Amino acid sequence: GDQGATFGAVVDQLAHVGGRVILTGMGKSGYIARKIAATMASTGTLAVYVHPAEAAHGDLGMISKNDAVIAISNSGETTEMADIIDYVKRFQIPLIALTSQRDSTLGKRGDQVLVLPPHREACPMGLAPTTSTTATLALGDALAMALMVRKGFTKQDFGVFHPGGKLGRQLSRVNELMHPLSAVPTVTPEQSMADVILAIPSGRFGCCGVIDPDGALLGI
């Protein structure tokens, strides 16, 4: 339907943005915006989070005419968003609105509007952002994944951005982690353990190689 077409148009726009994707939101929406920005940045789309309140005190300078802004507000009436919305409209920076209310201030001013489906918050009082934040996060993740596909982002690219932790180890190549034998302290089989103890600290690898007269590695 209309939302599917809008989603596709947003992906097209973000895939061709010349600068960065700027995520902004206040309160719980701000935390969701941060996570979406982090997911995009780690999957091939240059993205950052800008706090809407801080934006009014100088951080608007972080947003350039080459960027695109995704503004998140469940109600679409977050007062702290007013200055950043005015700024992007003034300089004709693309504004993508993520909101539950198409007829809200944010919904009316967005160049593209992604409307969350009707929902009731899981909070017993129907007040605390729960269902809305989960739906927004899912929508943001969907955008990030669609951009991955559009840009042809590969496992190798993913590995470049994730050098640490289990993911980094799984995607790293041996030649990226290995140290040449010339960098490792070595001893011969005839040397004493005292020599080994003295040699190990010089390489800072916590080990020592044992080599034969021809320099071939016999063991560690």
Language model regions located:
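The conserved cystathionine-beta-synthase
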Residues: 187-204
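Glycine-rich phosphate-binding loops that contact phosphosugars or nucleotide phosphates
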Residues: 15, 20-26, 30-138, 144-147
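An N-terminal, well-structured beta->alpha segment
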Residues: 1-15
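Short acidic active-site motifs
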Residues: 6-10, 55-59, 195-196
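Internal, active-site/partner-interface "lid" segment
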Residues: 108, 122, 149-179
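A glycine-centered beta-loop-beta connector
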Residues: 177, 200-203, 208-220
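Short, basic, glycine/proline-bearing loop/turn elements
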Residues: 1, 68-73, 182-184
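Flexible, glycine/charged-enriched surface loops at secondary-structure junctions
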Residues: 5-8, 153-158, 210-213
